[in-house]
From Swiss-Prot:
Record-level GO cellular component terms: nucleolus; preribosome, large subunit precursor
Subunit structure of this chain's protein: Component of the pre-66S ribosomal particle. Interacts with NOP7 and RRP1. Interacts with RSA4 (via WD repeats).
Intervals of motif Nuclear localization signal 1: 11-18
InterPro entries: NSA2_fam, Ribosomal_Se8/biogenesis_NSA2
Protein name: Ribosome biogenesis protein C3_06160C_A
Origin organism lineage: Eukaryota, Fungi, Dikarya, Ascomycota, Saccharomycotina
Keywords: Nucleus, Ribonucleoprotein, Ribosome biogenesis, rRNA processing
Annotated region described as Disordered, given as residue ranges: 1-38, 59-85
Localization, UniProt: Nucleus, Nucleolus
Superkingdom, taxonomy of origin: Eukaryota
Annotated family: Belongs to the eukaryotic ribosomal protein eS8 family. Ribosome biogenesis protein NSA2 subfamily.
Residue numbers covered by motif Nuclear localization signal 2: 51-58
Function according to Swiss-Prot or TrEMBL: Involved in the biogenesis of the 60S ribosomal subunit. May play a part in the quality control of pre-60S particles.
BP GO annotations: maturation of 5.8S rRNA; maturation of LSU-rRNA
Length: 261
């Protein structure tokens, strides 16, 4: 063994540290932070050399990604060189359909289907003011603080929902106004089923109301339709489907919705 390979000789003789793999993994994980720090702090000639090296790495990575993507595309997009004769211009677009074109067309078709699929029964709803939605709750020893709000509309919270500590809870969702199930009507079958709510997809009033799970007229909710036995074209059972609320839950005391099919 050459004299300058004493490190390899030591490894072969005594082995590595017990935590070598863990230290190596952590060092590789920190590499991104080190590179980012160097990019911000280096100056002068070292900064130029660093930028040049990073540029070369990025160019190589882009070439590698491009080559990988081109390898996935099936079918010749250009005539083969060994054929001996070139195709005329009017036949250039008559090559064998490749996977990229098929994927592109399928994505466009899915977008069109999605646009047709969600034609909601209530396209417009009346706006609700914050004064109507939230009730101010006075807090503090002398009831002088008014930073808490209580939602006056019906809401949906998930199964694993836990309230925050009382002193830090800014928005209160009363337990008496929480809904877990909805009366969902299937427009084609003409039947109404009492189905559990899975989540609130979109509240037309505000994204904040969507996040809070407020149930108002026109809200799109996701319901569990496994009881209906709906099946996709591929033979899979449909688990969740969207429905739109058609009534005022805070007035009626229940949630009525129409399934979007």
């Amino acid at each position: 063994m050459p004299q300058n390979e004493y490190i390899e000789q030591h490894i072969k003789k005594h082995g590595r540290r017990l935590d070598y793999e863990e230290r190596k993994r952590k060092k590789e994980a920190r590499e991104g932070h080190r590179v980012a720090k160097d990019a911000q702090t280096l100056k002068g000639w070292r900064a130029k050399q660093f930028a040049k090296k990073r540029y070369a790495e990025k160019v190589a990575m882009k070439k590698k990604i491009k080559a990988h993507q081109e390898s996935k595309v099936k079918g010749p997009s250009t005539p083969k060189a060994e054929d001996g004769e070139a195709l005329p211009t009017y036949l250039l677009d008559r090559q064998t359909n490749n996977t990229a074109k098929a994927i592109s067309s399928s994505i466009k078709q899915k977008r069109l289907e999605k646009a047709d699929k969600f034609q909601v029964p209530l396209p417009k709803v009346k706006g609700i003011s914050e004064e109507e939605m939230f009730k101010v709750i006075k807090t503090g020893k002398s009831k002088s603080k008014s930073w808490k709000r209580m939602i006056t509309k019906h809401t949906f919270v998930g199964e694993g929902f836990t309230r925050r500590p009382v002193k830090m809870e800014r928005i209160i969702r009363p337990a008496a106004l929480r809904q877990k199930k909805a009366n969902v009507t299937h427009p084609e079958l003409g039947v109404t089923v009492f189905l559990p709510i899975l989540g609130v997809k979109k509240n037309p009033q505000s994204p904040m109301y969507t996040q809070l799970g407020v149930l108002t007229k026109g809200t799109i909710i996701e319901v569990n339709v496994s009881e209906l036995g709906l099946v996709t074209a591929g033979g899979k059972v449909v688990w969740g489907k969207y429905a739109q609320i058609t009534n005022e839950p805070d007035r009626d005391g229940c949630v009525n919705a129409v399934l979007l099919v």
